[in-house]
Amino acid sequence: AELFPGILKATRFGYDGKGQAVVDSLEEAKQAFKELGEVECILEAKLPLAYEISVILARNHQEDIVVYPVGVNNHINGILSSTTVYSDLVPKDLVHEAQEHAKKLASGLNYFGVMCVEFFVLDESKLQSAQPRLVANEIAPRPHNSGHYTINATACSQFEQQVRVMAGMPLGDTSLLVPTIMLNILGD
């Protein structure tokens, strides 16, 4: 398998584009390794990315799971810029597949609370026949910035959902009330 182009990522404390570097050669990988502080890293293949989606779910102690509408994420310089959510944005079969993977992951980890699983959706025109079209990119065992849209756009926000799980209350309604675009504004 080709090593380059790839993304060199620190195995700990990397997020929002931090702790990673795109590398096109062994020389660039060595330089990036130095710039990352020579900490433990992994080299990921650069995938034919079409877009990224977030699946946000909540799982309670009775093992019930609710899933929020899937959002499509846009990044600028490796940092989430916006999440767009409306009913026909992502093909329904892809939504179902991603949600099922996320639910199996939460159940397999015996996780309780709100969790986000980000998936890369790969460009099918560039895939080889045996390659999956979804690749899990990030698992966040907490309310996630791509789910901040739930504050105003769903019946029950991801934050209220977390409280419901911890308090032993029934899970809330995740229905989308309005089509939404969430802008991620960061402070220093």
Give residue ranges: language-model regions.
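Short, well-ordered secondary-structure micro-motifs
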Residues: 53, 81-83, 136-138, 149-150
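Short acidic-glycine loop/turn motifs at beta-strand connectors
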Residues: 59-64, 76, 121-128, 186
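Intrinsically disordered, low-complexity coil segments
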Residues: 2-3, 89-92, 122-133
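A structural signal for short, well-ordered beta-strand segments
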Residues: 55-57, 70, 117-119, 139, ...
